[in-house]
């Protein structure tokens, strides 16, 4: 399988590494499959992984640097 939309270059503009991209896409795809609402009005892809990648490319889904919400002192 080959990703054609969104392009890997566009995705890597939003996320700092391919590893981070794959983890973020997998987690978001899991949320979409579990029934969480999509962040976009229209999708080009029918499958949750493709939809997650579209959301990442659009800047709607990002990595939370501090998932526990603790401020650095």
UniProtKB/Swiss-Prot annotation:
Signal peptide: none
Enzyme Commission code(s) on record: 2.7.7.6
Gene3D superfamilies registered for this protein in UniProt: 3.90.940.10
Domain of life of the source: Bacteria
Reactions accelerated catalytically: RNA(n) + a ribonucleoside 5'-triphosphate = RNA(n+1) + diphosphate
Keyword set, alphabetical order: DNA-directed RNA polymerase, Nucleotidyltransferase, Transcription, Transferase
Gene Ontology molecular functions: DNA binding; DNA-directed RNA polymerase activity
SMART domains linked to this entry: RNA_pol_Rpb6 (SM01409)
GO biological process, one term: DNA-templated transcription
CC per GO annotation: DNA-directed RNA polymerase complex
Pfam families documented for this protein: RNA_pol_Rpb6
Entry-linked InterPro entries: DNA-dir_RNA_pol_omega (IPR003716), Pol_omega/Rpo6/RPB6 (IPR006110), RPB6/omega-like_sf (IPR036161)
EC category name: transferase
Subunit structure: The RNAP catalytic core consists of 2 alpha, 1 beta, 1 beta' and 1 omega subunit. When a sigma factor is associated with the core the holoenzyme is formed, which can initiate transcription.
Record family assignment: Belongs to the RNA polymerase subunit omega family.
UniProt function note: Promotes RNA polymerase assembly. Latches the N- and C-terminal regions of the beta' subunit thereby facilitating its interaction with the beta and alpha subunits.
Protein name: DNA-directed RNA polymerase subunit omega
Organism expressing this protein natively: Lactobacillus delbrueckii subsp. bulgaricus (strain ATCC 11842 / DSM 20081 / BCRC 10696 / JCM 1002 / NBRC 13953 / NCIMB 11778 / NCTC 12712 / WDCM 00102 / Lb 14)
Gene (name only): rpoZ
